[in-house]
Amino acid sequence: MKFLALLSLVAAATAAPAALEARGATTCGSTSYSASQVTAASNAACNYVQSGTTAGGSTYPHQYRNYEGFYFQGLSGPFYEFPLRTSGVYNGGSPGADRVIITGNCDEAGQITHTGASGSGFVACSGTS
């Protein structure tokens, strides 16, 4: 009986990380990102914002004005955008279409993309409103 209780506890504990990862993953256009890719980009953006520096010779992260009016989980700005990549963390060069958005306090607000947007605007990636 104790063995079954222990087995149930172990099964629940090992299932929890997968559920957390699924919440942080996103899809921007047809490109999917894992939770760890989103977190890595958000952490890099946070480090740059806190140190007042940018990635490589780029302007990222830079302030995002939210002209589109995203809700971003009810978080308050200022917001900062930083490129989201499938291969490693952005360190300069072409930023691609996808971005993570963080607050000045380094809270992860959401993910947005130029893919499917008009002009230079943005649309939400999955999980962002």
From Swiss-Prot:
Stated family: Belongs to the ribonuclease N1/T1 family.
Enzyme class: lyase
Molecular function GO labels: lyase activity; ribonuclease T1 activity; RNA binding; RNA endonuclease activity
Documented EC number(s): 4.6.1.24
Active site annotation, chain numbering: H62, E81 (proton acceptor), H114 (proton donor)
Pfam families per the UniProt record, alphabetical: Ribonuclease (PF00545)
Name of this protein: Extracellular guanyl-specific ribonuclease ARB_00194
Keywords, ordered alphabetically: Disulfide bond, Endonuclease, Hydrolase, Lyase, Nuclease, Secreted, Signal
Main location, first listed in the record: secreted
Gene3D superfamilies the UniProt entry points to: Microbial ribonucleases
Subcellular location: Secreted
Keyword Nucleus: no
Disulphide bonds in the chain: C28-C125, C46-C106
Keyword Lyase among record annotations: yes
